[in-house]
C-alpha cells in the first residue's frame, strides 16, 4: 500500500506552520508514507508571501518552498505534489488539487474570483476541489454549522486531524448524504504531528 498525506503546510510559505519542507519529508520517511501534498495557504489565506508582489513574482515565491520540498523528497524517495489551500469566506477554505504553478501564473484573474468562479475555473483546468475542515468550530469562524455549498466541491475533508471527533462525524455524514467523496488530512503544520491521517492507494500514483 502507498500512503499519502493530503493536507500539509510548510513554514516558509504558510505563516501558521512550524516545520520546514525538509522536516516534513523526513517525517514522511520515518512514518512510512510514500508522499504528501503541499497545500500551503494561498492569496486569501494565512500566507507568508508578500501580496504586494506582482502576480508572477507572488506565484514564484509561493511555489518556491514546494519546489524545494519536492526536490528534497526526490532525493529521499518521497513523492511531493503541489496543492493549494485557498480561503473564500471567513474561516472557510478550499483544498485544490491538480492545478500546476504554470496555470496559476497564466491566470492573475484568479485572485478576483469568488468561491463559485474559483471552483468553476479549477474544474475547467482539470483540477479538483475539496472542502477543508467543514463544521470546524472556532471563535473566528461564523456559522460553523453551516453546510458547505455542494456545487463548489468534488469532495469533503471527512477527517481532519485538527477537528473534533463530532466535527469529523458531521463531515463524513454530509459527504455520504450528498454523494461526495471524503478525504483524510492531517492539516499538518508541525512535523511532530505527521502520520495521523492520509489516504492509502493500492498502486503508486503519478500525479
Indicate where each model-derived feature is located:
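Charged catalytic cores and adjacent phosphate/nucleic-acid-binding surfaces used
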Residues: 1-11, 20-26, 90-106, 120, ...
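Ser/Thr-glycine-rich phosphate-binding loops at phosphate-binding pockets of nucleotides
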Residues: 10-11, 35-47
Amino acid at each position: 500500500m502507498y500512503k499519502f498525506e493530503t493536507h500539509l503546510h510548510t513554514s516558509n510559505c504558510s505563516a501558521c506552520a512550524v516545520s520546514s519542507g525538509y522536516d516534513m519529508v523526513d517525517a514522511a520517511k520515518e512514518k512510512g508514507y510514500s508522499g504528501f501534498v503541499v497545500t500551503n495557504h494561498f492569496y486569501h489565506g494565512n500566507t507568508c508571501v508578500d501580496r504586494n508582489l506582482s502576480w508572477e513574482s507572488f506565484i514564484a515565491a509561493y511555489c518556491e518552498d514546494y519546489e524545494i520540498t519536492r526536490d528534497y523528497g526526490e532525493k529521499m524517495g518521497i513523492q511531493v505534489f503541489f496543492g493549494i489551500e485557498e480561503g473564500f469566506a471567513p474561516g472557510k477554505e478550499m483544498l485544490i488539487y491538480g492545478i500546476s504553478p504554470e496555470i496559476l501564473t497564466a491566470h492573475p484573474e484568479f485572485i478576483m474570483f469568488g468561491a463559485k468562479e474559483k471552483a468553476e475555473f479549477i474544474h475547467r483546468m482539470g483540477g479538483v476541489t475539496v472542502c477543508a475542515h467543514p463544521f470546524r468550530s472556532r471563535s473566528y469562524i461564523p456559522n460553523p454549522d453551516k453546510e458547505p455549498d455542494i456545487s463548489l466541491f468534488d469532495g469533503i475533508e471527512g477527517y481532519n486531524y485538527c477537528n473534533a471527533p463530532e466535527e469529523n462525524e458531521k463531515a463524513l455524514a454530509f459527504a455520504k448524504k450528498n454523494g461526495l467523496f471524503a478525504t483524510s488530512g492531517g492539516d499538518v503544520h508541525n512535523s511532530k504531528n505527521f502520520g495521523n491521517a492520509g489516504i492509502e492507494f493500492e498502486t503508486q500514483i503519478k500525479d
